Curated annotation (Swiss-Prot):
It comes from Arabidopsis thaliana (Mouse-ear cress). Keywords: Mitochondrion, mRNA processing, Transit peptide. Residues 371-401 have a biased composition (Polar residues). Residues 174-401 are annotated as: Disordered. Disruption phenotype: Embryonic lethality when homozygous. One of its GO terms (molecular function) is protein dimerization activity. It is found in: Mitochondrion. Residues 1-60 form a transit peptide. Involved in organellar RNA editing. Required for the processing of numerous RNA editing sites in mitochondria. Binds to the mitochondrial MEF19 and MEF21 factors, two pentatricopeptide repeat-containing proteins involved in RNA editing. This is Multiple organellar RNA editing factor 1, mitochondrial. Residues 310-327, 357-367 have a biased composition (Gly residues). Residues 237-252, 342-356 have a biased composition (Low complexity).
Length: 419
């Protein structure tokens, strides 16, 4: 910045001399201008440059008060752009890296004194009186009091890099930078404190980013492991959760019913769960409309609400070769001889057949390849205690309610299958 102000000052001086020459040339008549010889013009230019050169030292070392520049002020010869930059104090930087042996701090200071004496054409003792600061750490160079014309003599000296007008590093105390130098005595000063960047705001998604904000939590691999509800058979038990393989009790309770769900091989199908309470070690008992399953995967028959219904006879829930999950054939749940999801022809509702015993769940099932009154495994019979509470042929109020719900469910499933 100090170099910019120095160049700006020179530009102003050059512009002033150019304006003066323009005014003098405009006053001279046009007829007399060609008669002016080159020698006269040369003497005029030399005279003007000499006048400026002789006037500058008097101005620099005068007691005139300089005015610090403020935004909007007019820049004149007495304007100081930086506080302390009066063109009497100069900073000269040097470079010792090109030398074969590095210099110690004492050798650097001795080189500063010799360079100052050589540039000003004075002795080393006089140069020590001119120097007021130097540095061997933050930068390599020295500061000395001299005129602008004297500073130009340092351009061709070995080791000199920059020649800059110096300014205050501490305007309040009017202190220049570097270590203080007084007649060969160096007083070290701490380096200037630079204002650091503002730290970014803490990120709560990083470790150690601060307290009080939201943190990342680990997901639980099991969702909602809850025991079955205690109550009547007509109530709906809560979903038991979907545990990952190898955890829990070896049972996977898939998510609720999803229509048109396509699933790859060897993956547990997500079934329709209507009051389904799951036990230990039981296979996945799904029902799903439009569910496509590869052949060979074992699928138990449809399991509805916990109310029991008998199967067998003319009023049973008969199922033919295409009943249940059709494997390899049509992908819907159609009993034999029925165009919808419901009981066989001639059956009014899902109820116990004539002569049937206890209408327990999964008893009296008739189908191809199965004998009458064949029961399912114990793991597939849900809530057996509840099924034995009512005598044979006498359904309770919960059974009637469950049958009504089952009829409504079959009606809606039929609509889903058709559409």
């Amino acid at each position: 910045m100090a170099m910019i102000s120095h160049r700006l000052r020179r530009a102003l001086l050059t512009a002033t001399s150019y304006v003066n020459r323009s005014i003098s040339s405009s006053i001279t008549p046009a007829s007399d201008f060609p008669s002016v010889s080159a020698a006269v013009l040369k003497r005029s230019v030399i005279g003007r440059s000499t006048e400026v050169a002789t006037r500058a030292p008097a101005r620099l070392f005068s007691t005139r008060q300089y005015k610090l520049y403020k935004e909007g002020d007019e820049i004149t010869e007495d304007t100081v752009l930086f506080e302390g930059c009066d063109y009497n104090h100069w900073l000269i930087t040097m470079d010792f890296s090109k030398e074969e042996t590095p210099k110690s701090p004492e050798e650097m200071v001795a080189a500063y004194e010799e360079t100052c004496a050589q540039g000003l054409g004075i002795s080393v003792e006089e140069a020590k009186q001119r120097m007021y600061a130097c540095s061997t750490t933050t930068y390599q160079g020295f500061q000395a009091i001299m005129t602008e014309q004297e500073s130009e003599k340092f351009k061709d000296l070995p080791g000199v890099v920059f020649i800059l007008p110096d300014s205050y590093i501490d305007p309040q105390n009017k202190e220049y930078g570097g270590d203080k130098y007084e007649n060969g005595v160096i007083t070290h000063r701490p380096p200037p404190i630079q204002s650091g960047r503002a730290r970014p705001r803490p990120r709560f998604d990083r470790s150690g980013g601060g307290s009080g904000g939201p943190q990342n939590f680990q997901r639980n691999t099991q969702y909602g492991q809850q025991p079955p509800m205690q109550g009547g058979g007509g109530s709906y038990g809560p979903q038991q959760g979907y545990a990952t393989p190898g955890q829990g009790q070896g049972t996977q309770a898939p998510p609720p019913f999803q229509g048109g769900y396509n699933q790859g091989p060897r993956s547990p199908p997500p079934p329709y769960q209507a009051g389904y309470n799951q036990g230990q070690g039981s296979p996945v008992p799904p029902y799903q409309a439009g569910y496509n399953q590869v052949q060979g995967s074992p699928v138990p028959p449809y399991q509805g609400t916990q109310s029991s219904y008998g199967q067998g006879g003319s009023g049973n829930y008969s199922q033919g070769p295409q009943g249940g999950y059709n494997q390899g054939g049509p992908r819907n749940y159609n009993p034999q001889g029925a165009g919808n999801f419901g009981p066989a022809s001639g059956a009014g509702n899902l109820g116990p057949a004539p002569g049937a015993g206890n209408p327990g769940y999964g008893q009296g099932y008739s189908g191809p390849g199965q004998e009458q009154n064949q029961t399912f495994p114990q793991a597939d019979q849900r809530n057996r205690d509840w099924n034995n509470n009512n005598p044979a042929g006498q359904p309770g109020s919960d059974q009637v309610r469950s049958r009504s719900i089952m009829n409504l469910a079959s009606f809606f499933f039929d609509i889903l299958i058709r559409h």
